């Protein structure tokens, strides 16, 4: 089985527009999810545990909101899958942190990208994370 795809920095730079589009769509769904959570919390405050009983007047609305939340959470996974299809590894969603395998000074590293960066300007070793990232000019 072949190993992971290794990217040149410029190849990842070319994917940033696609990453931003996926994340924008994710933001829209995140806002919907937040609204659903607010509605569910309000219903829970009004009805308490009775909300889960089919005899509760707002039970159907509650179930509908819960189903929609599950659907949106599934959509989050599909967004992560889309990023994976581009070769990225999602390391965080808020803020979005995405890594791509690369080579820096002969070492296997992650090119490290977060939202708002127009190009890959940072990297970190594969056993490190975002807080350990270095500017491209820095040596290991």
Residue spans for each PLM region:
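Long, hydrophobic N-terminal alpha-helical segment
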Residues: 1-46
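Residues in flexible loops and secondary-structure boundaries
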Residues: 14-15, 34, 48, 91, ...
């Amino acid at each position: 089985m072949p190993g992971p795809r290794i990217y040149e920095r410029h190849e990842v730079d070319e994917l940033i527009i696609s990453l931003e589009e996926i994340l924008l769509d994710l933001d829209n769904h995140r806002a919907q999810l937040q609204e659903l959570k607010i509605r569910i919390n309000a219903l829970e405050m009004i009805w308490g545990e009775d909300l889960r009983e089919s005899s509760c007047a707002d039970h159907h609305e509650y179930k509908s909101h819960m189903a929609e939340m599950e659907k949106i959470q599934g959509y989050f996974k599909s967004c992560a899958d889309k990023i994976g299809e581009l070769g990225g590894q999602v390391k965080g969603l808020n803020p979005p942190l995405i890594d791509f395998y690369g080579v820096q000074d002969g070492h296997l590293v992650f090119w490290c990208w977060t939202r708002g960066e127009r190009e890959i300007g940072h990297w970190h070793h594969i056993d490190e994370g975002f807080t350990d990232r270095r500017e491209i000019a820095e040596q290991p």
